[in-house]
Amino acid sequence: MSEIGERVKKIVVEHLGVEPEKVVDNASFIDDLGADSLDTVELVMAFEEEFGCEIPDDAAETILTVGDATKFLEKNAKS
């Protein structure tokens, strides 16, 4: 997993309180990790803060899995 992927994983574990082993690229935030819509909004905000970038609403709607978040942030992260 990339350095950005590891940071994404850490944020997901902290925000959702899930076991690190469950946070894999194809894990759906809602279906696999038990997030609700508020959790997903909070995750997006945490990603924006951690990586110094804005995630527009239309992009946020396409970030459904850990891998989706990692791919988006690898392209758009400022830090």
UniProtKB/Swiss-Prot annotation:
Keywords of this entry: Cytoplasm, Fatty acid biosynthesis, Fatty acid metabolism, Lipid biosynthesis, Lipid metabolism, Phosphopantetheine, Phosphoprotein
Biochemical pathway: Lipid metabolism; fatty acid biosynthesis
Database matches in Pfam families: PP-binding
GO molecular function, one term: acyl binding
InterPro entries reported for this sequence: ACP, ACP-like_sf, PP-bd_ACP, Ppantetheine_attach_site
Primary location group: cytoplasm
Domain Carrier: 2-77
O-(pantetheine 4'-phosphoryl)serine modification, residue list: S37
SUPFAM superfamilies hit by this protein: ACP-like
Stored Gene3D superfamilies: ACP-like
Signal peptide coordinates: none
One record GO biological process: lipid A biosynthetic process
Tree of life domain: Bacteria
PROSITE patterns linked: CARRIER, PHOSPHOPANTETHEINE
Family in the record: Belongs to the acyl carrier protein (ACP) family.
Name of the protein this chain belongs to: Acyl carrier protein
